[in-house]
Design a protein with these regions (language model features):
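Glycan-recognition and catalytic cores of secretory/periplasmic carbohydrate-active enzymes
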Residues: 1-186
Length: 186
């Protein structure tokens, strides 16, 4: 959790920054199923540290603030890392009713909705669709949207928890964004 809360990450590697979301979701589910108070207390402490570190903008990943800008609001692998955080926040809310977790999930979703969507940044470079992409060589790394080899399908990762957020909140903007993502898949 220290690695995430310190927000100094600028490298493409995701291995350190995706584990906290997985752990929190698993710890909550295991703690609840086993009625393990010690595990739940530890999970609550870790979750609180992450939620308390969330920036006013809604960003809660490991990437340095100096790296991010309006033109590059996330580091290439943020979507992978934050996918698990989204799920943890929503699962904790669904299992416990913790409103801070729901608020954190909404703030994170709104961060993505602010930067990615119709007329904004996209997860897939529009000139890399068939037939324009035939015989075109591309760099396999993207500064803001993941991995070029799979045409930046990171939006589909985030579509899942953001659609879950729509189911929990009923806020149509989350459904609309998820439909936009799905509608842009070749």
């Amino acid at each position: 959790v220290d690695f995430v809360v310190q927000r100094q990450h600028t490298a493409w590697d995701w291995t350190k920054a995706e584990q906290h979301g997985k752990w929190i979701e698993s710890a909550y589910l295991s703690g609840i199923q086993r009625n393990d108070k010690a595990l739940l207390d530890k999970a609550r402490t870790m979750l609180k540290r992450i939620v308390d570190s969330q920036e006013e903008s809604g960003y809660v990943g490991a990437t340095s603030k100096d790296y991010r800008s309006d033109e590059r609001p996330v580091r290439g692998m943020d979507a992978y890392e934050l996918y698990f955080v989204f799920h943890a926040f929503i699962t904790v809310y669904e299992e416990t009713g913790d409103k801070a977790s729901l608020a954190a999930a909404e703030k994170l979703a709104d961060y993505y909705l602010k930067y990615f969507g119709p007329g904004k940044l996209e997860f897939w470079p529009s000139d890399l669709r068939d037939p324009e992409n035939r015989h075109k060589s591309i760099d396999a790394l993207s500064q803001f949207a993941g991995h070029g080899v799979h045409y930046s399908w990171e939006g589909t990762l985030l579509c899942d928890p953001i659609a879950r957020l729509y189911e929990v909140t009923g806020k149509k903007k989350y459904l609309d964004w998820s439909l936009w993502v799905v509608g842009n898949i070749d």
